[in-house]
Every structure is written in structure tokens, then in C-alpha cells.
Regions:
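N-terminal secretory targeting and juxtamembrane "stalk" segments of secreted and cell-surface proteins
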Residues: 64, 70, 106-109, 144
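Feature activates predominantly on carbohydrate-active enzymes
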Residues: 32-41, 121-154, 158-387, 395
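Short, low-complexity, Lys/Arg-enriched N-terminal segments of secretory-pathway carbohydrate enzymes
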Residues: 1-13, 44-61, 67-68, 74, ...
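N-terminal signal-anchor transmembrane helix specifying type II single-pass membrane topology
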Residues: 2-47
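Substrate-binding groove of N-acetylhexosamine-processing glycoside hydrolases
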Residues: 3, 12-18, 113, 137-142, ...
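Intrinsically disordered, low-complexity, serine/threonine- and charge-rich segments
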Residues: 82-87, 96, 102, 112, ...
Length: 721
């Protein structure tokens, strides 16, 4: 009997499984339909209610998706079963009911047709039928009803949103600004008084700074970058070559061994011309000349022998050297301006002159005042440029001018020779440029430039720039330019978005350019519009970001960009695709992994009672605990080695091998060494098999450093190594 029951269940396994699935799907559909009916609001009365309804219905959307997926899978199984039944039925009929069998009789007089037997037909009649009604699919009407309810709810919400938009048009300017600032707060975007759609005023010129010193990005990557910058509203580039320019003749040794070739730069500048960019080369002519003065052949021009930071302006050789540097760079760029086939614009040359820390210290310069030495040198360089290239305007950094009196600035006539570029990278511009200083500048210069930052300003060794801080810096500059621009007869020339690669020639790398792309595109799109647009359809940022999800806060109920807390982890940039996105997202993973390992090492070494420096000096610890403390170390080591190889692969198409190696050595290698030391320390402590009685010997170094009073007691000392 049991055997018969088992056979019966086995023959009807498909029917039973389909019947069970049907019962389950009916239950799921009924539950989901009730949930949907209860949670979908019929109308929305405000933006807040829309957001709340969207958040409440997120779970229902997920449930409906699962239900529709189950229905779809069941329909596929059912369709497959129907096709199989049809195929078996056709095969049976073709093999068992041959009414067309042809044979010759013995007389050869005709054809005999063999009829199907009654037994064969009864077998076909007894074959079980598919457990469906007709040829329709399971729950197709219910699935369509779910989709219809979803679309009805979306249409209702969009109609109410359109009604709210129409009502917003009747709001006052103050009310619209209040709504705008409220949405900025939800996004985590800094709210700056006076900046919004009603008062939008973009800077006339918007230049992006390319700092190439010591880390030359490949031209192929830079050409891709140009296309992105153009689409976001950039009008030009401030290019700082330093040792990456292909100098010639007496200056050949200034170029790094991995400097650009002239053909590469020509290709790049021609691409700049195609995009209609203006070019402003940045050539340091006073401070930050380490790349030249570090070399023995140019060391005699230093202001003081021990520091290559600043050049001595009192030596004639210094001026000859600077003139040749300027001549080679200016002539190289102007050849593209003079060619009729290009549209490269070059109207300004930046001569640096910031942070001149070594000034008036040599025997030749000490006889003059610092301010006078600075002004005289700047005027001499500017006069050389204006004498040879009258079409070029000279720009300098402003920080050395800030402490000077108004009288000194006016009597020097520096306003006739240069345009200052006022640089502040913090979130409080007026803390560095007071209203009084603005007034002084306005009485000396007819026009000025402003300089913000998108990277390289909040830490000399960061891996990823703090986007929110850089965005606030740029928005505050927009407010300052709107307020202070009227002081100058020609207003502000424009805003430069600086992106420093190193704090100076001897410093290690700041954030690499691909890791700073989110900061760059966010700040550039904002300054190009004059404010941060909260509407994703109107924000140019989304022109260059491709997402698998639709960044629309009205549909999801969540802001399409969120910069709260750790701004590095905005979903928009950690999930979407754009130029450099793979390395940016890798940097986030690397940052988190390094933080995890540092915390691990802190616990097993610094805060450990068994692997501390004391334990190591005295070789005194518990082997069992040491083994437990170091068991994760090999795993972490392997993870970092894997991340190093991944970094090399991701950066291969962006930088040369030297820059890649420097990044790995700077960010990953120190932690690898710390893990290796942890393993070595554990091995040393684990080799001990016998330990001394307490008290342990006192370290001799404590007496040598006079940290303890020496006593006459006979104490066995142990030397600290």
C-alpha cells in the first residue's frame, strides 16, 4: 500500500508542486494587495507628505517586486510544462495512430490503410491534463492589476507634485529661497545667505588648476578630463608644470626624467584649443623654486645656502635665470595662439610669488626692507613680460601683499603691472581677507581674481578630499564675489578652482586627481551656475555621472545627493559611473581597510597587555595569547597586497609607474610594514620557553636618560634596544 502511495505522489509531483505554488502565490498576492491599498495615499498635500509616503511605501515596492518575480517564475515553469505536454501528445499521436501506413498487397492492386486500435485511443484519452484553465497563465490578471495600481498611485503623486510646482510659482522670493535652503539642508549642502536661484551670478571666467609637479597624469586621461570640464562650464585652465615641462638648453636639467615630451603637450594644447579653453601658465618666480634651486648648478641663487625655497632677487644671475624660464614656457604656448587653425586663448601669465618664506636674509638683501624687496622683484618680472609680450597680463598670488599698508601699495604702482589672485581655501573667507583689506585692494587694483580649491587644501596627505568643505569654500566665494565685486572698477576677472598635487616640491602626494573628481565636478558645476541646483534635471553635475538608479528625490523621497556626515560616502559618487569613478570607489575601500587594520594594530600592540613595548623589551609574555593576537595578521597582509595590485591596475591608464609606486609606498606600504613587525614580534615572544622570576630587570635606559634616580642598590639592568 505504501509503495502504491509513493508511486502515486511521484507521478503527480508536478501537479502537486504547481498546486502548492498556486496556494502560496494567492496568499502572497492577497497580503501584498491589502498592504498596497492601505499604504498608497490617494493624494499628497505637501512635499513632506510626499517624502513620508514614499518612505512608507518602500517596503511595499519590494514586496510587490518579489511577488511579481514569483508570478513570472511560475508562469515560465507553467509555460514550459504546457509545451512539454503538447510535445508528448504530438509524439504519441504520430507513433500510435498511424492512419497513413502504406503497403502494397500481394496483387499490387492498391494501398492498405491501417486503422488505430481502440486500445491506443483509450491510452490517449486517459493521459492526465495540465492543471490550468484553458491556455492562460497563472494570476496574469492579478499581476496586471498590481501594475495598474502602481501606475495609478504614481500618476496621482505626479499630479500633486505638478500642482505644488504651480503653487510655488506664486510664492514670494523669500518663500522660494526658504524652500531652497530647506532642501539644501536635507542634502547636506552648505547653506550660504544670499546664494540661490534668485540671485545666481556665475563668475565670468572659471578656470581649473592642473598641478602637474611630480605626478604627471597621462595626456589621454587629461584629454578625457577636458571634455568633462567643458560640459560643466569651465572656460580655461591654470597649468602649473614645474619640473614636468620639457625645458631646453641651459635649463634642460630642470625637467624631471619623466617630464612631458613637447609632442605630448602639443597634442594636449591643441585639444584645449578645440574646446575653446583659455590657458594661463603658472610659473613660480620667487618662492617655491625648490625644483630648480635644489640642484647644485643653480644652488648659488638661493636666498640662504641651506634652503632652496626662495631665490635671491638681488643677484643678476637670478633674473637671467627667471627670464629664460618664462621665455621658454611663454613662447611654447603662444605658438598655438598665433596659429590660425586653432582658437587657443592666452591672455594671462601667472608668476606665483606666494609664501616667500626666505626673504631679505642674504648679505645683499638685508640692506633693504622685506616689502620693498618683494615689490621691486615682482615689478621687475612683470616689466620683463610686458616689454616682450604686451598682450599678456601678469597675475600674482596675493598673500604677500596682505600685511602691506595701503600707502606702500599705492606708491609702488604695482596696480599698473599685476592683477592679484586672492586665494582662501577655508570656509571663512573674511577671516583672511577683511573688509578693510578688500577696500585697500580696490584702491590699488582695478580688477582681481579669486581662488578656491577642490583638492589639496585640507591635509597634505589625504587620500580623498572632503567634498562638503570644498563645496562650502566655493559657495562662500560666490557670495564674497557678489558682495565685493562692485568695489573694483572692472570687477572680478573670474574664479580659479585650485587642485594642489603637493604642498611643495618636497612634500608627498595630496589626493590624486581621479580621487578628487567628485569634488571637482560638484564644485565646478556649482560655480558655473552661480549656485547649487537642487533639481536633478537642472544640475549639470548629472551630465557626467551615469547611475543605475534614477537620482530623483521626488520619486524616492530621499535627496538625490547626500553630503551629511562622512561626505566621501555619498551614494551618488560611490555607486555611479564617471571619469575616475573606479579609483575613487577603490580609495574609499582602501581607506576603510586601512582604518580597520590601524584599529586592529592599536588593540593588539598599543593597548595590549601581552604585546606591548614592555613585553618585547623583556621578552616576557603568554604564548597562547600572542598566537591569538596575531592570527588575523597574515589575512590583513594578503588583503593589502591584493589592494596594492588593484591600485596599480586602476592607475595604469592615468599615471606612470613612478606615481603609482609613490602612491602605494605612501598609503599602503607603511601598514604592510606594521603588520610584518607585528608578526615578527609575535614570533620573537613565542620562541621563549623559560621566563625569569619577578621582578623583571629595570631598563638601563631609564637611568641613562635620567628618568629614574640612580641608586646604590644592586640592580640588574636590561638595556633598551
Amino acid at each position: 500500500m505504501l509503495k502504491i502511495i509513493i508511486i502515486w505522489f511521484w507521478r503527480r509531483k508536478l501537479s502537486i508542486s504547481l498546486f502548492t505554488s498556486g496556494i502560496l502565490l494567492v496568499g502572497l498576492w492577497s497580503w501584498a494587495y491589502l498592504e498596497t491599498s492601505q499604504k498608497y495615499p490617494q493624494s499628497y498635500k505637501s512635499i513632506n507628505s510626499i517624502s513620508k509616503a514614499a518612505e512608507d511605501s518602500n517596503q511595499s515596492y519590494r514586496n510587490l517586486f518579489v511577488l511579481q518575480k514569483l508570478i513570472s517564475d511560475a508562469n515560465r515553469v507553467l509555460s514550459s510544462h504546457q509545451n512539454k505536454v503538447r510535445s508528448e501528445k504530438n509524439n504519441l499521436l504520430s507513433s500510435s495512430t498511424r492512419t497513413n501506413v502504406v503497403s502494397k498487397d500481394s496483387a499490387g492492386s492498391g494501398i492498405v490503410v491501417k486503422e488505430a486500435s481502440a486500445q491506443t485511443l483509450s491510452l490517449v484519452a486517459r493521459r492526465k491534463k495540465a492543471p490550468v484553465v484553458g491556455e492562460s497563465l497563472f494570476f496574469e490578471e492579478e499581476r496586471l492589476r498590481i501594475l495598474e495600481n502602481q501606475q495609478r498611485a504614481k500618476n496621482s503623486a505626479m499630479e500633486d507634485i505638478q500642482m505644488i510646482d504651480e503653487e510655488a510659482r506664486t510664492l514670494t522670493s523669500e518663500e522660494r529661497q526658504a524652500q531652497y535652503e530647506h532642501e539644501l539642508q536635507r542634502m547636506g549642502v552648505p547653506v550660504i545667505a544670499g546664494i540661490g536661484p534668485e540671485t545666481a551670478k556665475a563668475p565670468k571666467e572659471r578656470l581649473v588648476h592642473l598641478d602637474l609637479k611630480g605626478a604627471p597624469a597621462k595626456i589621454t586621461f587629461l584629454k578625457q578630463l577636458l571634455l568633462m570640464l567643458k560640459s560643466l562650464g569651465a572656460t580655461g585652465l591654470l597649468i602649473e608644470y614645474e619640473d614636468m615641462f620639457p625645458f631646453e638648453g641651459s635649463l634642460a636639467n630642470l625637467s624631471a626624467t619623466n617630464a612631458y615630451k613637447k609632442e605630448e603637450l602639443k597634442d594636449f594644447l591643441e585639444t584645449c584649443a578645440l574646446h575653446g579653453f583659455s590657458i594661463m601658465p603658472l610659473v613660480q618666480t620667487f618662492g617655491h623654486l625648490e625644483y630648480a634651486l635644489k640642484l647644485e648648478e643653480f644652488s648659488t641663487m638661493r636666498e640662504i645656502p641651506e634652503s632652496p625655497q626662495s631665490i635671491c632677487p638681488s643677484q643678476r644671475r637670478s633674473m637671467d635665470f627667471l627670464e629664460e624660464v618664462l621665455r621658454q614656457i611663454i613662447v611654447f604656448h603662444l605658438q598655438f595662439v598665433n596659429e590660425s587653425t586653432t582658437t587657443l586663448k592666452m591672455t594671462h601669465i601667472h608668476i606665483g610669488c606666494d609664501e616667500v618664506y626666505r626673504i631679505a636674509q642674504c648679505s645683499l638683501c638685508r640692506v633693504k626692507l622685506k616689502d620693498q624687496i618683494f615689490l621691486d622683484h615682482v615689478m621687475a618680472v612683470a616689466h620683463f613680460i610686458r616689454r616682450h609680450w604686451q598682450q599678456l597680463n601678469v597675475v600674482i598670488w596675493d598673500d604677500m601683499l596682505r600685511p602691506m599698508s595701503l600707502t606702500k601699495l599705492q606708491t609702488s604702482l604695482i596696480g599698473n603691472y599685476v592683477e592679484p589672485m586672492i586665494w582662501v581655501y577655508t570656509t571663512d573667507i573674511y577671516a583672511f581677507i577683511s573688509p578693510t583689506l578688500w577696500e585697500h585692494y580696490a584702491q590699488v587694483f582695478t580688477t582681481v581674481w579669486a581662488a578656491s580649491a577642490f583638492k589639496g587644501a585640507w591635509g597634505e596627505s589625504l587620500m580623498v578630499p572632503p567634498l562638503q568643505r570644498h563645496l562650502e569654500n566655493n559657495i562662500r566665494w560666490l557670495a564674497v564675489m557678489n558682495k565685493e565685486g562692485g568695489r573694483f572698477s572692472k570687477g572680478f576677472q573670474g574664479l580659479i578652482l585650485t587642485g594642489w598635487q603637493r604642498y611643495d616640491h618636497f612634500a608627498i602626494l595630496c589626493e590624486l586627481l581621479p580621487a578628487a573628481i567628485p569634488s571637482l565636478i560638484t564644485t565646478l558645476s556649482t560655480v558655473s551656475k552661480g549656485y547649487f541646483s537642487i533639481n536633478p534635471k537642472d544640475n549639470d553635475l548629472l551630465k557626467v555621472v551615469q547611475c543605475y538608479f534614477h537620482p530623483d528625490s521626488r520619486r524616492s523621497g530621499h535627496p538625490w545627493i547626500e553630503l551629511h556626515g562622512n561626505s566621501h560616502h555619498s551614494q551618488l559618487f560611490s555607486s555611479c559611473s564617471y571619469l575616475g569613478s573606479q579609483f575613487y570607489q577603490f580609495s574609499l575601500r582602501l581607506y576603510d581597510k586601512l582604518a580597520e587594520i590601524q584599529l586592529y594594530l592599536h588593540h593588539v600592540q598599543d593597548r595590549s597587555a601581552w604585546m606591548s613595548a614592555y613585553n618585547l623589551r623583556h621578552n616576557f609574555s603568554s604564548i597562547l595569547v600572542v598566537e591569538a593576537k596575531t592570527e588575523q595578521t597574515p589575512l590583513f597582509l594578503q588583503e593589502l597586497i591584493t589592494l596594492s595590485k588593484e591600485a596599480e591596475q586602476l592607475l595604469y591608464h592615468i599615471y606612470d609607474g613612478y606615481t603609482i609606486a609613490e602612491f602605494v609606498e605612501q598609503h599602503i606600504y607603511p601598514t604592510v610594514v606594521a603588520l610584518q613587525n607585528n608578526l615578527a614580534n609575535g614570533a620573537t615572544l613565542s620562541r621563549a620557553r623559560h621566563w625569569p622570576r619577578r621582578p623583571l630587570p629595570i631598563a638601563q635606559a631609564l637611568y641613562d636618560l635620567h628618568m629614574l634616580a640612580d641608586t646604590s642598590n644592586a640592580i640588574v639592568h636590561d638595556t633598551i634596544h
